[in-house]
Amino acid sequence: SWDWQVFCKDTIDGEIVPRCFGGAGDVTYLDWLLSAWGWTLSVSLLALGVALVLGSIMGILRTAPHRGWVLLGNAWTELFRNVPLLVQIFLWYHVVPALIPPLRGVPSFILVVLGLGLFTSARISEQVRAGIQSLTGGQRMAGLAMGFTLPQTYRYVLLPMAFRIVIPPLTSESMNIVKNSAVAFAVSISELTLFALQAQEETARGIEIYLAV
């Protein structure tokens, strides 16, 4: 039988806590679950912000008329898209701080946000590029003919139409980034995956734990 009171138990002594929320230093599994949700959403939202900014910039560069910018955007996209996410997280956590000493004091939370954000930026770059290239060439020429500079043409003509086209895949990507945030458990960030793994080991109530997650 299911035992939903598992979330009202103290994580130390296993005693049931009234009203399921710990106090005076006590932490219940419900407290832990809510904290894990907070970590997951924090990682996901911050990484999504990083990915949207960098991905949009790289997507624009890949459609620019200058070959150097195109090469930079393509190199960025291919690098971060083709290296597995878990490998990138380990590189940011173990290798990059060793190569750049000032980063040794950076919290693992920030490093995971950067790793997940850069990985997702490559995917968003591809979507933004496809959205811009789906527009007819006359849109760019019309903007330039009206006296806009190239940056103004992108800002006022191309990007508003392109982003309307790529809203569906961007919505899908925002859901993917929440799922991908599970890799944070590999560097001991107490998000939902780490909570589920540890809580089921301590309580032997895997079904209830994973249904709540």
Kindly give the residue locations of the regions a language model identified.
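Transmembrane alpha-helices and adjacent helix-loop boundaries
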Residues: 1-213
